[in-house]
Swiss-Prot record:
Main location: cytoplasm
Lineage of producing organism: Bacteria, Pseudomonadati, Thermodesulfobacteriota, Desulfuromonadia, Geobacterales
GO CC terms, sorted: cytoplasm
A GO molecular-function descriptor: dTTP diphosphatase activity
Reactions that this protein is recorded to catalyse: dTTP + H2O = dTMP + diphosphate + H(+); UTP + H2O = UMP + diphosphate + H(+)
EC numbers, comma separated: 3.6.1.9
Family: Belongs to the Maf family. YhdE subfamily.
Keywords, in A-Z order: Cytoplasm, Hydrolase, Nucleotide metabolism
Places the protein is found: Cytoplasm
Active site (catalytic residues): 72
Role this protein plays: Nucleoside triphosphate pyrophosphatase that hydrolyzes dTTP and UTP. May have a dual role in cell division arrest and in preventing the incorporation of modified nucleotides into cellular nucleic acids.
Keyword Cytoplasm: yes
UniProt-listed Gene3D superfamilies: 3.90.950.10
Annotated protein name in UniProt: dTTP/UTP pyrophosphatase
Amino acid sequence: MPENSRIVLASASPRRLELLASAGIEFDVFASDIPEEPIPGEAPADFSVRLAKDKAVATAARSEGRWFIGADTIVVCDGEIMGKPADGADAVRMLKKLSGVPHEVITGYAIYDKARDGILCKAVVTKVFFKPLRDEEITAYVATGCPMDKAGAYAIQGGAACMVERIDGSYTNVVGLPLCEVVEDLRTMGAL
């Protein structure tokens, strides 16, 4: 792929990397490193889109390529934005809050065209319904260490799959990148 037409994923997430690769897209990876704190009063979707945009633009300033994809996934339950848990106790708290109630998984993504200095930003929302969880289920899952680098303290594609009754919306969005939407937007922008 010519230097001036490369796609760069601005993320260290192995799940995003796997999803994008599964679509047969050639891309490079250049992890972004930006603060991930909401602005007081910021709506959850706006927060995730802002982070995605910041990741894409910051990565473009530090690396070669043409199109830069930034993404950020959050879980929202009863108005609380849940990012990655701080520790095991925080993971237990999050999973107890999600137990038996619907919540939203929001992935904001941004595709930045460095050559044209243009950006496309969107948020995709998927509703997830957890079954009621027993304390011992939560404790055993947290003990695996799996929840520690996941928004909302769970990975739908892993051991938490048995906690989910159903979803309304994009499965890949819950994993970390709404693949259908991202691929379509890459096509629209001329990257594919």
